Swiss-Prot record:
One of its GO terms (cellular component) is cytosol. Residues 688-707 are annotated as: Disordered. This is Polyribonucleotide nucleotidyltransferase. It is an enzyme of class 2 (transferase). Mg(2+) binds at D484, D490. The keyword Transmembrane helix does not apply. It comes from Caldanaerobacter subterraneus subsp. tengcongensis (strain DSM 15242 / JCM 11007 / NBRC 100824 / MB4). The gene is pnp. Its cofactor is Mg(2+). Residues 551-610 form the KH domain. It comes from the Bacteria. Residues 698-707 have a biased composition (Basic and acidic residues). GO terms for biological process: mRNA catabolic process; RNA processing. Residues 620-688 form the S1 motif domain.
Length: 707
C-alpha cells in the first residue's frame, strides 16, 4: 500500500493520519498523531469464522509503552507487564462504540490493537486510539458499518471544551467521552460533578458536531486508500426447520418468559429448550445448534413483543416500575462501615475501610503519576448467578464496573483537609439480576454514611433500557438481566439530587438520537430520586462518630526544616516513635503531618513526642532527659526524641564525682540544663546546674557530717 498522509483541524489542533507507512501486513493500520500524542492502531481478522460459538469474537488491546513518556519500567524485569487498570478501561472505551457496528452473525475473530507510542498530556491517547481504531477498521477489508468519531468534552468556566488540555481537565466540571456515527450516538461515558441532565445532553449534542467532522474526514480517507470489504458468509438456518421450531416452541417460550422470578424463569426456559431438542433430535440430529439459535430468536422476539404490545415486562412490571428495594447498614460488626443494598434479585454488600493517608494508591502509567485517596473495588463471584467457575483475579468487567461506581462517588468524597483518611470501598455482588454496578453505587453511599464519612451528598444509580422497533421507542426503567441481554441499550446513570455524577451508555443498535437520550435521562432522574428516598429511610446522614474500630487521625503542621529531625538518622527517630506508640506517621513536604493511631491516646502521645522534637532546644532551658549511654568522661542524655547531649562528669553533681556510675545509670530520668549548643549543633548539658537549691544545701550538710 502506498504511504499517504491525511490531515484535519480538530478543536484547534492538527489530527494527522498516516496509512501505508507501517504494519502493512495487518488488514488495516493507522498511524495517528494529535498534538504530540502518537498511537498506532491495527485491525486484523481471521479468514474463517470460528465454529461453535454464538457471539462475535472481538478483542481490543490497549498497549501502554513507558517509552512514550521517556520512562524505563520499574522492578527487576524492566519491561511492561500485564495491562494497567487504566489500559483495561481504555480498551473497553475503544471496544464499546465499534462492537455494535459489525454485521450481525459475523463470527470471524477480530483483533484491534492500539499501541501508544508517544504521549502529550494535552492530547489524551485513548481518544486518539478510538479515532485510530475507526480508521484502521474502515480502510480494511473487515466488514464494519462505520466509520465512527470520538471526542472528549469538558465543562470549563461554563463553556464546553472539545478534547480539553491537561490544565482544562483539572478545572473541568465533567469529563465526557462521546462516540458516534454521522447520524447517531453509539457510546457515552461520563464523570461529572453533579452536572444537570440538560447540560449533559447539550454536551453530547455539541460533541456530535465534531464527531460528524471526524467521520467525514475518515470517509475521505476510505475513498482514497480503503479496500473492498470481504464478503461475509453468514450461516443460514434451514427455513423449514425454523418454521417447525417456531410452530412448536413459540407459545411454550412465551409462557416460560412470563415467570416473575429469575431462577424459576431460567429453569422453565431450560426445560423448554430440552423439550424442543428432544422433540427434533431424530428429525434434525445435525442441526441442534441451529435449533438453539432459533429458540434465542423466539425468546428475544417474544420478550420485546410483550413489552411493545402489552406494555408489561417478564417480571410483571410496567415500563417505569422499579423493583422492590430494601437496604440495611451496619451489617458487619468489626468493619468501619457496611451496607447491603437489594433491588429485586440484585443484591450487593459494600464495605468501607478507612486507612492512613499513606495508604493511598500510587498509579504509574503513561499519564502523570496519580494518587488515589479513594478507591472502589467490585467483585462478581460465580455464586451470584448460581454458576460454578474457577475463582481468578478481577476481569475486565469487574474492573470496568468498579471504576464506574468509583467515578459516581468521587465528586462527593470529602477533601483530604476535611477528612484525612484513605477510603477503600469493596462491593461484593451477592446476587445478580441486572445493574449490579448501580447497586454498588447505592451500597457505597450507604456504607460511607455508616462509616461516618462526611460525604457532600448521597448518590444513587439506575440502569435504563431501550426497546426500539422501527419508529416506536420504549424506555425501560431499572432493567434486569434478560432486558439488558435482549434489549437495545444499557444506559447507566448515577447522581445526587442535584445532578449527574457518572454515565455509561452502551447500545446494540447502530445509534440513538437526542430525543431518546433526553427521554432516558429524564426517566433516570425520576427513578434516581425515588431510590435516594428509599436509601435515606435507612440512614438519613453520615454518622457523627466513626466506628470504634476505625483508626483516629491527629493532624499537625510542623516547620518543613524540622522534618529531617522527626525522621532522624537512617529513620531511627520516627521508627522509635512508631514502635513506642503503635501509630503510623505520614509527612508531606510542606510540613503537614498525619498521625494515624489505633486510639486517640496513642495519637496524642505520638504528637507530644513530635512536638518535643520540633521544639527548639534553648540554652538555659531545663529538660527531663533519659540516660542513654555512659562513658568514663560523662553521660549521654536524650532530652527529646532524636536529640541528645553530653553531661560531663564534672557537671553531674556539685560535689566531686569519681565514677559516673556513682551518680547515674543507663535508663535513669534526670533533670538537665542546656549550657551550650556549639557550631556543630552538639548540645552540652549540666546536671548540677539543674539541681534545686535544696539539693545543693543537702549536699553541703552531707559533706560537713563527713568532715
Amino acid at each position: 500500500m502506498e504511504e499517504r498522509t491525511f490531515e484535519m483541524e480538530l478543536a484547534g489542533r492538527k489530527l494527522v493520519v498516516q496509512t501505508g507507512k507501517v504494519a502493512q501486513q495487518a488488514n488495516g493500520a493507522a498511524w495517528v498523531k494529535y498534538g504530540d500524542t502518537v498511537v498506532l492502531v491495527t485491525a486484523c481478522a481471521s479468514k474463517e469464522p470460528r465454529e461453535g460459538i454464538d457471539f462475535f469474537p472481538l478483542t481490543v488491546e490497549y498497549e501502554e509503552r513507558l517509552y512514550s513518556i521517556g520512562k524505563i519500567p520499574g522492578g527487576f524485569i524492566k519491561r511492561e507487564g500485564k495491562p494497567s487498570e487504566k489500559a483495561i478501561l481504555s480498551a473497553r472505551l475503544i471496544d464499546r462504540p465499534i462492537r455494535p457496528l459489525f454485521p450481525e452473525g459475523y463470527r470471524n475473530d477480530v483483533q484491534v490493537i492500539a499501541t501508544v507510542l508517544s504521549v502529550d498530556p494535552d492530547a489524551q491517547p485513548e481518544i486518539v486510539a478510538m479515532i485510530g481504531s475507526s480508521v484502521a477498521l474502515s480502510i480494511s477489508d473487515i466488514p464494519f458499518n462505520g466509520p465512527t468519531g470520538s471526542v472528549a468534552v469538558g465543562l470549563v468556566d461554563g463553556k464546553f471544551v472539545i478534547n480539553p488540555t491537561y490544565e482544562q481537565r483539572e478545572k473541568s466540571l465533567m469529563h465526557l467521552v462521546v462516540s458516534g456515527t454521522k447520524d447517531a450516538i453509539v457510546m457515552v461515558e461520563a464523570g461529572a460533578k453533579e452536572v444537570p441532565e440538560e447540560t449533559i445532553l447539550d454536551a453530547i449534542v455539541y460533541a456530535h458536531q465534531y464527531i460528524k467532522q471526524i467521520v467525514e474526514f475518515i470517509e475521505g480517507i476510505v475513498k482514497e486508500v480503503g479496500v473492498p470489504k470481504a464478503e461475509v458468509v453468514l450461516h443460514e438456518i434451514d427455513k423449514e426447520l425454523e418454521e417447525k421450531v417456531r410452530a412448536y416452541a413459540t407459545e411454550k417460550i412465551y409462557n416460560a418468559l412470563r415467570t416473575p422470578e429469575k431462577k424459576e424463569r431460567n429453569d422453565n426456559l431450560d426445560k423448554v429448550e430440552q423439550e424442543v431438542l428432544e422433540h427434533f433430535k431424530d428429525e434434525y440430529p445435525d442441526n441442534l445448534a441451529d435449533i438453539d439459535e432459533v429458540l434465542y430468536k423466539i425468546m428475544k422476539e417474544q420478550m420485546r413483543k410483550m413489552i411493545k404490545e402489552e406494555k408489561i415486562r417478564v417480571d410483571g412490571r410496567g415500563l417505569d416500575d422499579i423493583r422492590p428495594i430494601w437496604c440495611e447498614v451496619g451489617v458487619l460488626p468489626r468493619t468501619h462501615g457496611s451496607a447491603i443494598f437489594t433491588r429485586g434479585q440484585t443484591q450487593v454488600l459494600t464495605v468501607a475501610t478507612l486507612g492512613a493517608i499513606g495508604d493511598i494508591q500510587i498509579l504509574e502509567g503513561i499519564g502523570d503519576e496519580e494518587f488515589k485517596r479513594y478507591m472502589h473495588h467490585y467483585n462478581f463471584p460465580p455464586y451470584s448467578v448460581g454458576e460454578v467457575r474457577p475463582l481468578r483475579g478481577p476481569g475486565r468487567r469487574e474492573i470496568g464496573h468498579g471504576a464506574l461506581a468509583e467515578r459516581a462517588l468521587e465528586p462527593v468524597i470529602p477533601s483530604e483537609e476535611e477528612f484525612p483518611y484513605t477510603i477503600r470501598l469493596v462491593s461484593e455482588v451477592l446476587s445478580s439480576n441486572g445493574s449490579t454496578s448501580q447497586a454498588s453505587v447505592c451500597g457505597s453511599t450507604l456504607a460511607l454514611m455508616d462509616a461516618g464519612v462526611p460525604i457532600k451528598a448521597p448518590v444513587a444509580g439506575i440502569a435504563m433500557g431501550l426497546i426500539k422497533e422501527e419508529d416506536e421507542v420504549l424506555i425501560l426503567t431499572d432493567i434486569q438481566g434478560i432486558e439488558d441481554f435482549l434489549g437495545d441499550m444499557d444506559f447507566k446513570v448515577a447522581g445526587t439530587e442535584k445532578g449527574v455524577t457518572a454515565i455509561q451508555m452502551d447500545i446494540k443498535i447502530p445509534g440513538i438520537d437526542r430525543d431518546i437520550l433526553q427521554m432516558a435521562l429524564e426517566k433516570a432522574r425520576k427513578a434516581r430520586l425515588y431510590v435516594l428516598q428509599k436509601m435515606l429511610e435507612v440512614i438519613k446522614e453520615p454518622r457523627k462518630e466513626l466506628s470504634k474500630y476505625a483508626p483516629r487521625v491527629v493532624r499537625m503542621v510542623v516547620n518543613p526544616e524540622k522534618i529531617r529531625d522527626i525522621i532522624g538518622p537512617a529513620g531511627k527517630t520516627i521508627t522509635k516513635i512508631i514502635s513506642e506508640t503503635g501509630v503510623k506517621i505520614d509527612i508531606e513536604e510542606d510540613g503537614r503531618l498525619y498521625i494515624t493511631a489505633p486510639n486517640l491516646e496513642a495519637g496524642e502521645r505520638a504528637k507530644q513526642m513530635i512536638e518535643a522534637i520540633t521544639k527548639d532546644i534553648e540554652v538555659g532551658g531545663i529538660y527531663l532527659g533519659k540516660v542513654l549511654r555512659i562513658a568514663p568522661f560523662g553521660a549521654f542524655v536524650e532530652i527529646a526524641p532524636g536529640k541528645e547531649g553530653l553531661v560531663h562528669i564534672s557537671n553531674l553533681s556539685k560535689k566531686r564525682v569519681r565514677r559516673v556510675e556513682d551518680v547515674v545509670k543507663v535508663g535513669d530520668n534526670i533533670l538537665v540544663k542546656v549550657t551550650e549548643i556549639d557550631k556543630l549543633g552538639r548540645i552540652v548539658l549540666s546536671r548540677k546546674d539543674a539541681m534545686p537549691d535544696e539539693e545543693e544545701s543537702d549536699n553541703r550538710k552531707s559533706d560537713n557530717r563527713k568532715k
